[in-house]
A protein has these predicted regions:
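Active-site helix-to-loop segments that bind/position phosphate- or nucleotide-bearing substrates
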Residues: 1-110, 118-120, 126, 131-143, ...
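Short amphipathic alpha-helical interaction segments
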Residues: 89, 239-252
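Glycine-rich/acidic phosphate-handling loop/turn and adjacent ATP-lid/helix
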Residues: 123-158, 199-218
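Long, low-complexity, charged/polar intrinsically disordered regions in eukaryotic proteins
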Residues: 157-205
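Short acidic, hydrophobic short linear motifs in intrinsically disordered regions
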Residues: 223-236
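A short, conserved structural fragment
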Residues: 254-265
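Short, cationic-aromatic polyanion-contact patches
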Residues: 264-278
């Protein structure tokens, strides 16, 4: 809030965006409320559920995450003691994608709002605005926020952090479930991040295999390590008997100038690979 000359107080746009009970009460902010849409199947033909979250981000963020998680398909694990369910999607990645869409949106673009679209096989999180950093360097780039005050307040409210680790965590969570890495698509005035459910290696499109391989190399590099045939097999859950699959993917990634050999003089069996920019 800000104190006016007449002694009264006014609510700033930032205060309303975070703490408003209803964003529609503020002319410029009504379209900034996040929407969550659940579709039937894998296309947009039939909408099953649609929910706008009209409260300020600080009030409704956790509710958005819980609502989205509740709509995600899950697996039931039955053992002798109890029944448990596990999501088919990497939940830490879902949370990070939602937080990023709120923090990094371009608030000056009118007629557009952050949106989460849920399909049977993927989640698409879209926000107005394009990335401030090169997509290929999204893992190792220092943090850069479009809305510094918004990001700072959300960090103080423990909704996010400003350490630039969001994408690291998103990719690691996907790797833990053998899911493809989050796909980034940049359009003229918006950015879309797609998270995929569990998928067999043979069913992953080649473009997503290459992107996952590249981001795995980036993660290994910033940890002081390097991508190997074994680490890539572990990342995708490929058995050792199918090591030729990971070898072909590495060769393809080299051909696309995504990764390169660390030491060309190393024996092929012990070859290590790093991102092309390293």
């Amino acid at each position: 809030i800000q104190k006016q000359d007449n002694g009264l107080y006014s609510i700033t746009n930032l205060g309303a965006l975070l703490f408003a009970k209803d964003l529609n009460e503020f002319a410029r902010l009504g379209r900034k409320a996040m929407r969550v849409v659940k579709y039937k199947g894998i296309n947009r033909l039939l909408i099953q559920k649609e929910e706008p979250f009209n409260q300020g981000y600080a009030i409704c963020f956790e509710n958005i995450v819980r609502y989205v998680n509740a709509l995600l398909p899950s697996n039931e694990d039955v053992n002798a003691v109890q029944l448990s369910t596990t999501s088919k999607f990497p939940l830490p990645s879902v949370r990070e994608a939602i937080a990023n869409s709120l923090i990094h949106q371009d608030l000056y673009i009118t007629g557009a709002a952050p949106m989460v679209e849920i399909f049977d096989n993927r989640i698409e999180v879209t926000n107005p605005g394009t990335p401030l950093v090169d997509v290929l360097r999204i893992i190792d780039n220092p943090p850069k926020s479009r809305n510094e005050k918004l990001a700072s307040l959300m960090r103080r409210l423990k909704m996010c952090e400003e350490l630039g680790r969001g994408w690291d965590r998103m990719v690691l969570a996907c790797e833990a479930q053998y899911s493809p890495a989050p796909r980034i698509e940049v359009f003229q005035d918006s950015t879309k991040v797609t998270l995929f459910s569990e998928m067999e290696f043979s069913n992953i499109p080649m473009e997503d295999k290459l992107w996952s391989c590249y981001l795995h190399a980036c993660l290994m590099y910033i940890q002081g390590d390097a991508l190997t045939n074994k680490s890539l097999r572990d990342r995708f859950g490929i058995p050792e008997t199918s090591s030729s699959s990971s070898s072909r993917l590495i060769k393809e990634a080299i051909g696309k100038n995504l990764i390169k050999v660390l030491d060309p003089n190393t024996a092929p069996r012990y070859m290590k690979y790093i991102p092309i920019w390293a």
